[in-house]
Amino acid sequence: VIEGISCLDYLVMYTKFKIFNKPEDNKLDTVGEHEIGINKVDYDGTLWDLSVKDWETYVDYNLRDVELLVLLDEKLQYINLIRFLSHAGLCGLSQAIDTVPVINGAVAIKARQHNKYISTFFRPARIGKNPGGAVQDPKVGHVRNVVSFDANSLYPSIMISLNISPETKLGKVERNGDDVNIQHVSGRTFTLTKEAFVKYMKEEKASLSKSGHLFTQKEKGLMPEFLDNLYTKRKDMKNLGKEKEAFLNQNKSILSQEEIKKLEVDIQKCDTFQNAYKICLNSMYGYMGNLYAPLGDDDIAASITLTGQAINGKNRDLFVEYMQNTYGISDQEAEACCIGADTDSGYFSLYILEEKHGLNLLEDGMVSDRFYEECDKISEYINTHISEWVIKNFRSLDSRIVYKRESVCDAGIFLVKKQYVLHVLDDEGLKVKKFKYKGVAVVTGKMPKVVKPYIKTVIECLILEKDRDKCNGYFNDAYEKFKELPHHNICHISGMNNFEEYSKKCDGLKMANKMPVALKAAYRHNYMIRELKLDGKYPKFKTGDKVRYVNLKTPNRYGLETIAFHDKYPKEFEEIFQVDYEKQFDKIVFASVKSFYNAVNWTLRKPNENVRIELEDFLS
């Protein structure tokens, strides 16, 4: 340890702050290519061998690693972000990566401004888990004319609206026949008549969360004040970034390359810092449920999530109410418009308005003014009535719950909870034409990067054209290209935990009971490295490594079904084990595309199978 020197792991920072558009894994080579288009020096062996055999390349290898980190931070600004969080939370640079130290320090500053002091005592562990956010099962299938309405920072807004803070908590309410029991924070229990309870609520200016907890609103709490300040700063930073992005888009043709680069860096900086504010805002709920947070409180955590569930459910109800009141549609038609909901948002289809009322989404290839106007009317209706509802139901004196139009999409497909693909034409007011992938296999780190474009081509054709013959053509083309790819481009990718624990229970090539597939493949790799006396040539797997593994053709000399490797498939394995490309294609490409075909009731056949023509295909 060198006093005054902080050690920051850029991998940890990248994992923490990279929220959207993530690469398939967090290796420096992958991240460098993904973010700045530069790779590490290509070398497959151990660094020790490289240093002995080729010192000059060894030096270049290390210099390139340093260069990559410098260029990455020039773009991402994560070190500045850590410095900002460190100052905001009165903690060391290495501590600023964690939520608890930053919020402790930031709230302590806010408390001191009011001549208050925060607790430093740890609370007892809660039995069981706090309730989480509710996610609605979506209407599975192809959808058109979709608009999403998203709550502005729902959980922080709930804390501000109900003045939720440790020092404002009064107790918990429980019904007792016609009376009301209050379990007060002092430890005492009071029983009040309904009339006395109403009087008590008025005197305390108390809000009532969905979990039944009371919070006084006589004075603004530390947490709501802290969140209010963060929310304002994030909004300002986000608006600044949008202004710079709009200016760049409008003037790109007349700006110099130097000016464009500076604007792009400024836009990235704005995005990084608004995301930092967002992380702090959204971390407050997690902080409240954290056993090691001095100000943590499970009653507050439950109050936030259960109130959030109720509010997002009301958002859906108000949309249905608006559609029925304005257009006189039936309950069944209104229900069909409600596509799905995440924790803080709802997805609705307005296609029925195009069918029955001539409200077209598109006009000259762009979202029509009439469609925007209708979205604004829906948003206004939801916000007016949800504010009234929050004030009435939760006794809020300062409702901050606001739903805004997030995305306008002409088409998309929903599979299951939190898994969908949408073709977005408007993203928070910015006119775009892009696909938004959420939760599906093709955007996870478990799928090889080279394979993803083949699958996306099929999915995007299905969404925009819904042409089965064309989609099948793309799928068959993907199969032909897949067969020509090297092994490292068609492998499964997985993380690995508890590897040593499972490995100890293995006996030769007899695997431990319930050992995960990726761990089996990694164990077999290590076994074969020893068996073939390749210890100095290829590193062995250990817990925490990213595992690439493939299915093998059977039978083979060792009877193995799968085997793992690091970056490149060892040539020594080639002589013993043949990779089963058919099975790899089935598990990676076929399985992914099949889920989308199933969603629209299409049948997907494997390209290598000779199957009879089904009646539905003959008649279609």
Predicted regions: what they are:
Residues 84-96, 128, 174-179, 250-254, ...:
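A glycine-rich phosphate-binding loop feature that marks nucleotide/adenosyl-phosphate handling sites
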Residues 346-377:
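Catalytic palm subdomain of template-directed nucleic-acid polymerases
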Residues 18-22, 59-62, 96-97, 144-148, ...:
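Hydrophobic alpha-helical scaffolding
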